[in-house]
Regions:
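Transmembrane alpha-helix termini and helix-breaking/packing motifs in multi-pass membrane transporters
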Residues: 90-106
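Hydrophobic core of transmembrane alpha-helices in multi-pass small-molecule transporters
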Residues: 41-55
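Transmembrane alpha-helical cores of Major Facilitator Superfamily
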Residues: 25, 48, 78-86
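Structural signature of the two symmetry-related core transmembrane helices
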Residues: 18-33, 111-112
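Loop-to-transmembrane helix entry/capping segments in MFS-fold secondary transporters
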Residues: 70-80
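Helix-to-loop junctions at the C-terminal end of transmembrane segments
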Residues: 3-16, 99
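Intrinsic disorder in cytosolic terminal tails and internal cytosolic loops
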Residues: 124-148
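Intracellular juxtamembrane helix-capping segments at the cytosolic ends
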Residues: 55-68
Length: 148
């Protein structure tokens, strides 16, 4: 919350795609470093950096607000919350089992998730809006218009 206003201004200035790209690249490095660190001071510094990058995740919400139809906001947000909640239960449970075998591997898997998120962020257009939800050549409306 300490940097929320500045992060919001940064997202407004550089856009959601660039903000999420910065976040995920940073998280890749942080998670790999977590997997390699062996002293508490470095881990504490990484923890602070980790939370600073996670604060940029607000860009996902601003992206959603730009592309979503206002009448679909509540239902879509509900589905998104449910999916996130399921992931927040299943992934830590599975990684808890991995932790018993290798603590470093847990963080390398986290870096892998950040790589996947980075790739997904590249699908966000630089100026998102209704009808411009993705950089892919065929959006939802074009696919429906093209027919089977």
């Amino acid at each position: 919350w300490l940097f929320a206003e500045r992060i919001g201004a940064l997202i407004h200035r550089i856009g959601e795609r660039r903000a999420l790209t910065i976040e995920y690249i940073g998280l890749i490095f942080v998670f790999v470093a977590y997997g390699l660190v062996d002293d508490a001071t470095t881990a504490a510094v990484l923890y602070v950096i980790d939370h600073m990058f996670f604060a940029m995740a607000i860009a996902i919400s601003t992206y959603f607000q730009k592309i979503a139809d206002p009448k679909d906001m509540a239902s879509t947000a509900g589905v998104s919350f449910t999916i996130s909640h399921i992931a927040a239960i299943v992934i830590p449970a599975a990684l808890g089992l991995v932790w018993m075998w290798s603590t470093s591997l847990v963080f390398f898997i986290g870096a892998g998730f950040a790589v996947l998120s980075l790739l997904a962020a590249q699908l966000i257009p630089f100026d998102p809006g209704p009808g411009q939800e993705t950089v892919l050549p065929l959006g939802r409306d074009q696919v429906a218009a093209a027919g089977p």
